[in-house]
Amino acid sequence: MAKKSLIEKANRPPAFRVRQYNRCKLCGRPRAYMRKFGVCRICFRSLCYRGQIPGVRKASW
């Protein structure tokens, strides 16, 4: 879990637009963010395994 202070800081509008960065909507993690889904890779993986993201399934080839 990310620090509460950093999550709140990311929610505030920055003084300059280039300082804005994405955070996971579930856990607040700033790294490995997937724009299309709005979550980090760890939360994405757990949501996929539970079948909560429609159209996503495990690859096999």
Swiss-Prot record:
Function per UniProt: Binds 16S rRNA, required for the assembly of 30S particles and may also be responsible for determining the conformation of the 16S rRNA at the A site.
CC cofactor note: Binds 1 zinc ion per subunit.
Stated name of the protein: Small ribosomal subunit protein uS14
Keywords linked to the UniProt accession: Metal-binding, Ribonucleoprotein, Ribosomal protein, RNA-binding, rRNA-binding, Zinc
Organism lineage string: Bacteria, Bacillati, Bacillota, Clostridia, Thermoanaerobacterales
Subunit-structure text: Part of the 30S ribosomal subunit. Contacts proteins S3 and S10.
Family from the record: Belongs to the universal ribosomal protein uS14 family. Zinc-binding uS14 subfamily.
Record-level GO cellular component terms: cytoplasm; small ribosomal subunit
A Pfam family it matches: Ribosomal_S14
Gene name, Swiss-Prot/TrEMBL: rpsZ
One biological process term in Gene Ontology: translation
Named cofactor requirement(s): Zn(2+)
Originating species: Desulforudis audaxviator (strain MP104C)
